[in-house]
Amino acid sequence: SKGPSGEDPSPASDVVLTDEELAKIKEMGATAAIVFHYGGNDWSRAQLNGLQTQFAAMGIEVIAVTDAGFKPEKQVSDLETIMAQSPDIIVSIPTDPTATAAAYRAAAEAGAKLVFMDNIPAGFVPGKDYVSVVSADNYGNGVAAAHLMAKALGPDGGESGLVFHAADFFVTKQRYDAFKAT
């Protein structure tokens, strides 16, 4: 899969920090805020656990964790509240690329380094407005889901319904498009 702006993917295994680099990061005394689109499921809890564990190993203090309940206006409010604490890093999944863009822009302009998961705000340029976007191979997940569905339906086939999620969410569209194409 390509990224939201057509970026070529890189596996997480390509990111390796030396002991010296980790020591420098720890010396920074950096802080992070985790601004989720939704936190009420196993996937979000697993992501949060992974982020908190890795930040702790790197000496980065997590000063805030929010759950917008998939409401853009709540996420904007969360970002505004968090910025009063001046985090060095914000890891986030934007609920709506357009409705949240100004709040993310304000956070970046205030000096927070932005790392996105799965979705980016409208008009944001990689490497300029944000550090990175991380995601699974969602197109590949859609292909795999289609093959699993075909196997479950058996050789005689059958009918299945595919529900389109109308929210402007990059990775959901990737999975949907891949499932349909397969």
Q: Could you tell me what each predicted segment is?
A:
Residues 1-182:
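A residue-level marker of the well-folded mature domains of exported/periplasmic proteins
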